[in-house]
Amino acid sequence: MISSNDFRTGTSIEIDGAVWRVVEFLHVKPGKGSAFVRTKLKSVKNGSVVEKTFRAGEMLPQALLEKSSLQHTYMEGDDYVFMDMSSYEETRLTAAQIGDSRKYLKEGMEVNVVSWNDTPLEVELPNSVVLEIKETDPGVKGDTATGGTKPAILETGAQVMVPLFLSIGEKIKVDTRNDSYLGREN
């Protein structure tokens, strides 16, 4: 059990048999009446976001999520297959379960799979990944006086904005949290 006073961003709670993650929270102490906690909760299962208000100090069941490090081995139809490298046990996730993470997912990549009651819920990518540029416009010398950017499509199909000097075939480091270019990779 966890008190609504102890909510932090990322806290997982269980409401009506579903797992929700706290995205935003605000402790409100009105001049008249009792204090309460206003939250935005994101469903771990389907990604929907709802606003919910709890009384201050209200006790809720905390969802105990398990993280396991798995390697993405291959795709079979629309399913992504992951393998536990110590037990060689396979776990399958659908494209809907993976969500936006799939734009950075490539075979052989190690990721954390979050499970609840032995049911895989979502994939947590590393904060940055190294990917190859597959498509981008050529950068012309003297295009801008200051650093400009152009769109580039990476080997996984993700699109990020990169500096003008980069060309097709170069490997770059990308931040998976905000889709930003971090630098060149050798």
UniProtKB/Swiss-Prot annotation:
Pathway: Protein biosynthesis; polypeptide chain elongation. Its main location: cytoplasm. One of its GO terms (cellular component) is cytoplasm. It is found in: Cytoplasm. One of its GO terms (biological process) is peptide biosynthetic process. InterPro entries: Elong-fact-P_C, NA-bd_OB-fold, Rib_uL2_dom2, Transl_elong_fac_P/YeiP, Transl_elong_KOW-like, Transl_elong_P/YeiP_cen, Transl_elong_P/YeiP_CS, Transl_elongation_fac_P. GO terms for molecular function: translation elongation factor activity. It comes from the Bacteria. It holds the Pfam family EFP_N. Keywords: Cytoplasm, Elongation factor, Protein biosynthesis. Belongs to the elongation factor P family. Involved in peptide bond synthesis. Stimulates efficient translation and peptide-bond synthesis on native or reconstituted 70S ribosomes in vitro. Probably functions indirectly by altering the affinity of the ribosome for aminoacyl-tRNA, thus increasing their reactivity as acceptors for peptidyl transferase. This is Elongation factor P. It comes from Synechococcus sp. (strain CC9902).
